[in-house]
Amino acid sequence: MEVTLERNLGDKPLRIQTGKLAKQASGSVVVSYGETITLVTVVGSQELRPGIDFVPLSVEYQEKVYAAGRIPGNYFRREIGRPSEKETLTARLIDRPIRPLFPKTWRYETQVIATVLSMDQENDPDMLSMVGASAALCISDLPFFTPIACVRVGRIDGELVANPTISQQENCDLNIIVAGSRDGVVMVEGGGQFISEEEMLDAIYFGQESLEPLLEMQEELMEKAGVPKRSADPVEKDEYLAAKVAELADPEIKKALEINDKLERQDAIRDVKKTVMEGLGEEYEDRGKEVSEFIHDRTRVIMRAMVLDEGRRIGGRRFDEVRPITCEVGILPRTHGSALFTRGETQSLGILTLGSSGDEQRVETLYGDETRPFMLHYNFPPYSVREVKRISGPSRRDIGHGGLSTRAIKEVLPSKEDFDYTIRIVSEILESNGSSSMATVCSASLALMDGGVPITNPVSGIAMGLMAEGDKIVVLSDILGDEDHMGDMDFKVAGTKDGITSVQMDIKISSLTREIMEKALAQARVGRLHILEKMLTTISESREEMSPYAPKVFTIQIHPDKIRDIIGPGGKVIRAIQAETGTRVDVDDSGLVKVSAVNLEEGEAALQMIKDITAVPEVGAVYEGTVVKIMDFGAFVAILPGTEGLCHISQLDTKHVKKVSDVVKEGEKIKVKVLELTKDGKIRLSRKALLEEENGKSGPENGAPQRDKNRH
């Protein structure tokens, strides 16, 4: 049955249609807003996946280039290879609010695919894909019962706007995505230009209020679809074994949770299993996996009870206490800037590299090709958490953490007019026990200052947690990995002393009240400023001088008509300049030439070559040129690269010249003076004028040839 529903969102209608496309999927919807259209499908396998202890959900987001009326620019002219950064980040946005809503015992492979079919350059398909994913799940036979809606919130000239267009987003000083259900907000992602905590709260709850029509549509769709829902296979629990494990494990778990050191604590928890297995005897020696699951469950219960009932955290920290912090800068001598930020057992090494405009990242998107002068890359090697894994390209998590940190830092970067460099920061996570993305923000900020990049303000970040059961609610600052894993919220906040630049929030409970979120943001501000103070004791402002190994950038403006002279046939000339001087030369369509060099001498040498190539002859100027061709009537002399003029036979010498070759030879270097630039582009030269000047004589006006007195 074909069903189409429509509600106004912002200044235009949003439509959800089902029953027309992809009807063999478990659920499929087409979401339209303006002329942007996405197809979202969901399929749940009919076969149980045994031997796993997690929900096997995968989410894919695909931006088809045809949606924007374009052909892919790669060799194959089709979409190939890994998803783009935008596709990866959007897939994570879709995944995060829906994953917690599946039954914890769901063990059937489930795949959500969002495909952008049409893009109008004004309405971003990411929000449509998030709404579509929830709608497709709601009308499917999968056990997904809670509609989730999503809206982008922007602020333009102080006014909050729901779903600003792409062009409007350029004028927003706040830009966040809010996802929520009937119960409340479940996810927040975005940032802004130094936003206060109260302003951020207002934006989040403005977004929550804007979700109402989208939730109504999905509820109506569910009712009209009327598809019976499958149930998750219940996991049979051996209550006797669970009780026995609790009896044997609880005392040892409590002791382990008193250990502050992460690795020692993990080893102690691992030893708990050995103790329990010995206590259970041979009868249960083949039930090790179940025992491990029961121990994990008891660890969660005991740790949460420590916090909620006893008011204690792992290692004895206060709820609002930040772990010890150390900062170092300039630790890598050949890089352009470096910093080591350590907070407890989380450590990030930030490395700054500066480049020319030619080093900017070029990205093909549905909006067209764009360049990015700032990049921040996050790496999480397995040794950082004492694991052994295959090293491959960046994971979705790596890309997501990099995106979060990028938002935090980019607001404090100087403009291209003030600092004409491409900036790349790499964060190497050397060890991790919670909040490595916020450690990345701190190390990146320190590395920028160490490298002499004139940022407006340093940025720090903190991860907040939550544990809530009934009326018992505790907000935790600077959470550990265990507190994140066994807690109810992961709320990352980054910013300067003047306000927030980046936020990311995910919760595992049904919703948060405004009061809890307000407390979390206020507590986060105190923690952020504490971390910032520690950073500033190491380096208080950007260095006045950049690293001697950083490139020097020189610029020169040339006439656009001269661009082809610098490039040369097939790039021959520009490659020769770069090879001879050891520099990098970039030219844009306006004729702005940028030379990137390691030292001053190389840069000036390249600039001089460019000036010589693009120089325009001036009347009265003297040039040392090379005779390139001899004719009966004179000699052609190359006075500049690609520029030749004629020195007439009468202008070769002060005395009468019978034969040109008697005075000059091909390949000979001679000095000549420019007499005239004719309207048809020809250049008249004179050697004779210079000889007369050397002899103290003045030739005829304008260098006109003299009549031979012996001729009648």
Curated annotation (Swiss-Prot):
Which CDD domains does the record associate with it? KH-I_PNPase (cd02393), RNase_PH_PNPase_1 (cd11363), RNase_PH_PNPase_2 (cd11364), S1_PNPase (cd04472)
Tell me the superkingdom of the source.
Bacteria
Top enzyme class of this protein?
A: transferase
Q: Which InterPro entries match?
A: ExoRNase_PH_dom1, ExoRNase_PH_dom2, ExoRNase_PH_dom2_sf, KH_dom, KH_dom_type_1, KH_dom_type_1_sf, NA-bd_OB-fold, PNPase
Localization per Swiss-Prot or TrEMBL: Cytoplasm
GO cellular component term, pick one: cytosol
Reactions this protein catalyses: RNA(n+1) + phosphate = RNA(n) + a ribonucleoside 5'-diphosphate
Q: Does the keyword Nucleotidyltransferase apply?
A: yes
Which residues are involved in binding Mg(2+)? Answer: D484, D490
What keywords tag this UniProt record? Cytoplasm, Magnesium, Metal-binding, Nucleotidyltransferase, RNA-binding, Transferase
> Could you provide one GO biological process annotation from this protein's UniProt record?
RNA processing
Claim: Ribonucleoprotein is one of the keywords in the record: no
Stated family: Belongs to the polyribonucleotide nucleotidyltransferase family.
Could you tell me what this protein is called?
A: Polyribonucleotide nucleotidyltransferase
